[in-house]
Design a protein with these regions (language model features):
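Intrinsically disordered, low-complexity, hydrophilic segments
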Residues: 1-152
């Protein structure tokens, strides 16, 4: 159990939730060695499993056009700004940041996304990611605690 909690990358939770929402299975392999991990990867590939990288790109392709359209409504150039926009979008879906206003966690965002943080595209992407997380339930649900505060 302890190994499981340590091994799941939180940055990818939105991809797991998206896959499950579309009826796909999500398989986690906990390998004790590089050789074991390589064998597991080969086995998964031969069974037709999609890699996390492939799933990430497929997910983005599925939402890219509507996001591009929305971004360009104000005369912006999505193709030039896509890298920063996408970083902001994905940052908003992280379990530790979901639903939180940009201003509230700006210092953490600046620390983790120093290359993109100061761009308007990153901020716009973050705002769109927050909205997308709410609309699609890709952000982890918030739970009401007994004290009345909300917690992820």
């Amino acid at each position: 159990e302890e190994k499981t909690e340590e091994g799941l990358p939180k940055d990818e939770v939105y991809l797991y939730r998206d896959a499950l929402a579309h009826g796909h299975a999500v398989v986690f392999v906990l390998a004790d060695s590089k050789e074991e991990a390589d064998r597991a990867e080969l086995t998964m590939k031969s069974a037709g499993a999609e890699s996390l990288d492939a799933a990430r790109e497929k997910w983005w392709v599925g939402i890219r056009e509507p996001e591009k359209e929305h971004y360009e409504e104000n005369g912006k150039h999505f193709d030039a700004d896509e890298t920063h926009f996408r970083r902001g979008f994905v940052a908003a879906l992280h379990p530790e940041r979901h639903g939180k206003p940009f201003e509230l966690i700006s210092s953490k965002l600046q620390k983790h996304y120093s290359e993109s943080y100061h761009t308007e595209a990153f901020r716009k992407g973050y705002q769109r990611g927050v909205r997308h997380g709410r609309e699609t339930n890709l952000a982890p649900p918030q739970v009401q605690t007994q004290s009345g505060s909300r917690k992820a």
